[in-house]
A protein has these predicted regions:
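Repeated scaffold domains used in trafficking and secretory/extracellular systems
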Residues: 17-24, 57-65, 93-104, 141-153, ...
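WD40 beta-propeller blade core
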Residues: 40, 78-79, 127, 166-169, ...
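A short helix->beta-strand "capping" segment at the edge of beta-propeller domains
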Residues: 1-18, 45-48
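Residue position within the beta-strands of beta-propeller blades
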Residues: 32, 71, 109-110, 158-159, ...
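Blade-level signature of beta-propeller repeat domains, shared across WD40, Kelch, NHL, RCC1
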Residues: 301-362
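Short loop/turn segments that connect beta-strands within beta-propeller blades
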Residues: 43-47, 81-85, 129-134, 170-174, ...
Length: 362
């Protein structure tokens, strides 16, 4: 299969100036945050920049709701006007600001303290603010959270590293409730699946499908889980070894650690599993058929692609140089059709030239 360049199928390309650390698509808004603290918003339809601010970096997480953007930035939590980028309020947190989620006017944030002397995290805090930035409650614990998702009861669910590992459930007016998971392996990543399920990836390569009553672990694999996404009841995990594993039973293996996974346009009918890998020198983005893992499309890129963010018809990719590429389903289909036609024309020309050389006795 021919490997195309990422640029050749992108609807537009924009820049942040330093490594992209987070992406979000919300309606016609595409937001990107950088290592150095730039946060920018573009129109998905036109590509026009709507606003751009500079604050302390990195921008670690973003949440959008009710005309606002909430950003975990360096050691702060910011609330911004989604139309202008103006900062409405800012609150300092303890340590690094890691995650933010919003539900029905409640703003949840998580921060962590890293001690250089021992090269480990020593304390984390979950913060609960109202929409005006007033602190309502906070909870402290020893582990860093590697997943921070909204629970259907209005609280949050955290996936923990060592020492306790497992899950931590936090609700307003209650103490934090710890839930061990089978294997007791540190959580490395998580995602929210369908029907209230949480997908939790571990350092031993397992994926746990978690509901209120049960957790169903997959088998161990040779390397940690680095990325997870889902489609319906199926889940897909990306591993440090380069494997992309499906709960449907297939495995795709290629050189380079998997950096990110997302559902996105396939270039034909339906959607595919987008996975970015980095081999230390270049990135390869592979689009896989969800049913059987067959390769639909391969894209090459010279920088590390750490972040993928998608909606039904669009997918955004952010790289280590700060470039953001938006790929739209309709443009991708047209572009791939054009590439195929150009390739066919080139092959026909080559065949014709070969016939002429034979006729001339060359």
């Amino acid at each position: 299969m021919a490997v195309h360049t990422l640029e050749s199928v992108s609807s537009f390309e924009r820049g942040l100036g330093s490594a992209c650390t987070v992406l979000r698509i919300d309606g016609d808004d595409l937001l990107g945050g950088s290592q150095e603290g730039v946060l920018a918003c573009w129109s998905v339809d036109s590509g026009n920049e709507r606003w751009r601010i500079e604050t302390n970096g990195p921008i670690s997480d973003l949440a959008m709701t009710d005309g606002r953007v909430y950003a975990a930035a360096s050691s702060d939590l910011l609330a911004l006007d989604a139309n202008t980028g103006d900062i409405i309020w800012s609150r300092p947190l303890e340590g690094a600001s890691d995650f933010v989620q919003v539900w029905e006017g409640v703003v949840w944030a998580a921060s962590s303290v890293y001690e250089i002397e021992i090269s480990d995290y020593t304390e984390s805090t979950v913060w609960m603010f109202d929409s005006e930035g007033s602190l309502q409650e906070q909870w402290a614990f020893s582990e860093r959270a590697w997943h921070f998702g909204l629970h259907e009861d209005g609280g949050v669910l955290l996936g923990l590293g060592r020492p306790r590992c497992g899950l931590l459930r936090i609700r307003s007016g209650e103490g934090a409730s710890h839930r061990p998971l089978e294997g007791n392996s540190p959580v490395t990543v998580g995602a929210c699946g369908s029907e209230g399920r949480f997908l939790i990836g571990h350092s031993d390569g397992r994926v746990c499908v978690v509901t209120d009553s049960v957790d169903e672990p997959s088998k161990e694999r040779s390397s940690p889980v680095r990325a997870i996404c889902s489609s319906g009841q199926a889940w897909f995990s990306g591993h440090e070894s380069g494997e992309i594993v499906s709960s449907r039973g297939w495995v795709d293996t290629a050189p380079g650690a998997v950096e990110s996974l997302a559902m996105g346009p396939s270039g034909s009918n339906g959607s595919g599993i987008w996975g970015s890998r980095w081999n230390g020198e270049a990135s390869c983005v592979t689009v896989l058929e969800a049913a059987d893992g067959s390769i639909l499309l391969e894209l090459g890129h010279c920088h590390q692609i750490r972040h993928l963010q998608s909606t039904d018809c669009n997918i955004a990719l952010g790289d280590s140089s700060g470039r953001i590429h938006l790929i739209e389903e309709a443009f991708l289909s047209r572009r791939l059709k054009g590439i195929v036609e150009e390739t066919d024309d080139s092959e026909r020309r080559s065949q014709l030239m070969e016939r002429l050389r034979r006729l001339r006795g060359v």
